[in-house]
């Protein structure tokens, strides 16, 4: 397994799954610094910008891109 795959697996394992991937709210992103914060920002705000439902949110509870 190469370094990139190991890093991505480690990043996924350290992401909290219970709060919509909001990494900054849980640990400030200090674990991987800007890389982890950027990954969290993409997951957090991409759905809100597009007004889509995030995949972890039931459609009936979705309101303008937020659960």
Curated annotation (Swiss-Prot):
Residues 21-48 form a propeptide. Its main location: secreted. It is found in: Secreted. Contains 2 disulfide bonds. Residues 1-20 form the signal peptide. Keywords: Cleavage on pair of basic residues, Disulfide bond, Ion channel impairing toxin, Neurotoxin, Secreted, Signal, Toxin. It comes from the Eukaryota. GO terms for molecular function: ion channel regulator activity; toxin activity. GO terms for cellular component: extracellular region. Expressed by the venom duct. Probable neurotoxin with unknown target. Possibly targets ion channels. The cysteine framework is XIV (C-C-C-C). Belongs to the conotoxin L superfamily. This is Conotoxin Cal14.2c.
